[in-house]
A protein has these predicted regions:
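Beta-strand/loop-rich accessory regions of lumenal/periplasmic or secreted enzymes
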Residues: 149-157, 193-462
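Short, acidic/polar linear motifs in exposed loop/turn regions
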Residues: 101-106, 170, 339-341
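Short beta-strand elements
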Residues: 172-204
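Short structured motifs
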Residues: 80-82, 97-100, 124-131, 145-149, ...
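Hydrophobic beta-strand positions in extracellular immunoglobulin-like domains
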Residues: 98-102, 116, 149, 166, ...
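Extended substrate-binding grooves/exosites of carbohydrate-active enzymes
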Residues: 1-96, 101-108, 113-121
């Protein structure tokens, strides 16, 4: 807003760093470890502001938070804007407005490069030779540039992104030779993915039929062969609608899920907001208003399961599983609220989130995803996180340096995500559009236990 409205200021920093001290505690086994202390961690009974001192853009150990990544992007002084609101109708070229916010430096001091990417593949690159002037009075220097793009034949599921990067031509005088310096002073990403491209319906006519469908009184066991020749098996609880024990070649991949999930671990700003305790689902259970409706295709290649989920809140939710004989499962979920979920209104609580949760078996540590990354990001803080293909591990997703354990590890704009073991076997989840996802070794309910204030971070400093 501070760039689009003349009467709005913004982008100011409240605190640069979390104001905390490394503090020693004695563990139950008599050993000692350290954590980042705050509030009343040293002298009980004295007035304190709890963890209010922990709102910096750097952690207490001076490493950057994901907020610092966003801050750097928001403060950059070269910015790019689309001339046309709809950038998906390119017709072979696009126009971009370039704005120079430097007070004394023209853009001739920088190298400006662009790259067109299809998914994670770069299909064309180029440079912009600009001499956009610096500010004059209170007016920024700006000009409009045209980028010629190759003709492409996009298909449903393809993602096209244009990335623009600005780097210094000459190393700055203030930068000594012993400092790490990535040379990037500004960047932007534009989504050029055409809209309206629909995926073709899954054609299961060429699939082999299920090898086995055992329909018991309360559990249906389904087995078959994947497209790669692996043997899969899963169990469906007809009473609860929960899928469990999904195995590939005898190894359990998915222990349980998906189940509705409405609980998000509170962050520090959420403390005044009331969450309905009924939303907690520590055991990942699910209840139905009526028995599951199950229909097996006469060709033995497709099973549809329809569920009317019983919820602890004033809302309705239906779920559908389309289970195919190659091991793929298409999950559809519809949530219809009957309440405003307005905290502060008599008898109403906030609804932290609407989603699904799955419990993956141990050993599936390798994480790969296509979406905003690589740092944790949220819907109100993701413009600095470029859409791309990222690899990590589940252990690396938990952000342990927050003074008070809170919601963390989220990624937005997810097209697909996967978890695999050392052998490369695993589980992949993809979306028709985009979703948010996280992969953690702890549940949201574990981060904010109901019995204590959980004063210590779950992972000590050493």
């Amino acid at each position: 807003l501070n760039r689009t409205m003349d009467n709005v200021q913004g982008g100011f920093i409240w605190d640069w760093v979390d104001q905390s001290l490394r503090t020693t505690r004695e563990n139950e086994d008599g050993t000692y470890s350290t954590f980042w202390g705050y509030g009343g961690d040293w002298i009980d009974g004295l007035s304190n502001a709890d963890a209010f001192c922990g709102n910096g853009v750097l952690f207490a150990d001076r490493t950057p938070t994901a907020k610092a990544v966003q801050m750097r992007y928001d403060h950059q002084q070269v910015n790019f804007y689309p001339v046309d609101e709809d950038m998906t109708e390119t017709d072979g070229q696009i126009q971009i407005r370039v704005v120079n916010e430097y007070e004394n430096t023209s853009l001739s001091a920088f190298d400006i490069a662009w790259a067109l990417k299809k998914d994670d593949e770069t299909i064309k690159t180029g440079t912009l030779e600009l001499d956009t002037p610096c500010m004059s009075g209170s007016t920024f220097g700006e000009e409009t540039v045209t980028i010629e793009l190759p003709q492409v034949e996009p298909k449903a599921g393809d993602t096209y992104m244009l990335e623009v990067t600005v780097t210094n031509k000459v190393r700055p005088d203030w930068d000594s030779s012993n400092m790490t310096y990535d040379n990037v002073v500004a960047y932007e990403q534009f989504d050029l993915t055409p809209s309206g491209l629909e995926r073709e319906p899954l054609n299961y006519s060429m699939m082999d039929a299920f090898t086995s469908v055992e329909d018991g009184e309360t559990v249906m066991t389904i087995s078959g062969t994947t497209g790669t020749g692996a043997v899969f098996s899963l169990e469906l609880d007809k009473t609860t609608g929960i899928i469990s024990n999904y195995t590939i070649d005898g190894q359990v991949v998915l222990e349980k899920g998906p189940v509705p999930s409405f609980w998000r671990a509170q962050n520090y700003n959420d403390i005044p907001v009331y969450y309905d305790p009924a939303l907690r689902n520590d055991d990942d259970e699910m209840e139905l208003n009526a028995p599951a409706v199950i229909a097996v295709d006469e060709n033995g290649k497709h099973i549809r399961v329809e569920l009317d989920v019983k919820l602890p809140v004033d809302a309705e939710q239906t779920m559908t599983y389309d289970i195919y004989s190659n091991g793929e499962i298409v999950v559809s979920s519809a949530f219809t609220p009957k309440s405003n979920f307005a905290p502060g209104t008599a008898g109403e609580y906030a609804l932290p989130k609407v989603g699904l949760r799955m419990t993956v078996a141990p050993g599936y540590e390798d994480l790969e995803y296509f979406g905003h990354g690589p740092d944790e990001n949220y819907v109100d803080r993701n413009t600095a996180s470029l859409v791309g293909l990222y690899q990590s591990t589940v252990a690396e997703q938990f952000v342990s340096k927050y003074l008070k354990p809170q919601e963390n590890g989220n990624r937005t704009g997810i097209r697909w995500t996967s978890l695999t073991n050392e052998a490369g076997t695993g589980l992949m989840v993809s979306a028709d559009g985009t979703v948010e996802s996280s992969a953690l070794h702890v549940k949201a309910e574990d981060i904010n236990p109901s019995t204590t204030s959980y004063p210590y971070n779950s992972q000590p400093i050493r």
